A protein has these predicted regions:
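Non-catalytic, conserved peripheral segments adjacent to functional cores
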Residues: 169-170, 177-183
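Proline/glycine-rich low-complexity loops and linkers
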Residues: 1, 6, 92-167, 171-173
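Short, glycine/acidic-enriched loop or turn micro-motifs at the edges of active sites
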Residues: 23, 82-86, 94, 169
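Gly/Ser/Thr-enriched, mixed-charge loops and adjacent short helices
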Residues: 1-70
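Short, high-confidence coil segments that cap the C-terminus of an alpha-helix
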Residues: 72-74, 160-161
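Generic enzyme active-site microenvironment
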Residues: 18, 79-81, 89, 122, ...
Length: 183
């Protein structure tokens, strides 16, 4: 946390942020991060007892945060899942901004500032194909899980890493998925 704050490139000064910690692992850190970045931070579901993790809370029950943000006139809200490895966002009107949307917005932001190494954004296996198409339109590469079929080869970004993996897969007789790795 200290490193991100020390960069001085992110400021939430004057932004009213709602957090739903799902009574999970983010309960004691999420507020501290946003407070340190200058946000006016409001938190729900930050009282874990070992039994209530994700219980009608967090990213799997986003409706609680939607209502909280709208009723308290907040600018934005973030809902984490119990172990805080997933996050959804809610705008000031209660509209949900999905993880793919967050990744797209931040990927474009980082590209515009020249902060992406090789203009590549890493996605999850759960990312929607629409995200890949949107990144393609912005000339952003995404290392993806490659399936050993000729059809899947056509959707890969044309990068040196993708070409190397493509050659390796097509020259083998493997019929199992081969994960791509960035070098």
């Amino acid at each position: 946390m200290g490193y991100l704050i020390s960069l001085g490139i992110y400021s939430f000064k004057g932004v009213k942020v709602g957090l739903d910690c799902a009574n999970g692992s983010s309960w004691n850190i999420a507020k501290s991060v946003f407070d340190a970045l200058g946000a006016d931070t409001y938190v729900i579901n930050a009282q874990p007892n070992g039994l209530n993790i994700n219980l009608n809370a967090g990213s799997t029950h986003i409706e609680g945060l939607q209502k909280f943000v709208v009723e308290n006139h907040l600018d934005v809200g973030f809902a984490y899942d119990g172990d805080a490895d997933r996050c959804l966002c809610v705008d000031e009107k209660g509209n949900v901004v999905t993880g793919d949307h967050i990744l797209y917005i931040y990927g474009c932001y980082m590209k515009e500032r020249g902060k992406l190494l090789t203009n590549t954004v890493v996605t999850t296996v759960m990312s929607n194909f629409g995200l890949y198409k949107a990144f393609d339109e912005k000339a952003l590469a995404t290392p993806r899980r490659l399936w050993a079929t000729s059809t899947s080869m056509s959707i890969w970004p044309r990068t040196a890493a993708a070409s190397a993996v493509s050659r390796a897969v097509t020259s083998s007789s493997a019929s199992t998925p081969v994960p791509a790795t960035a070098s």
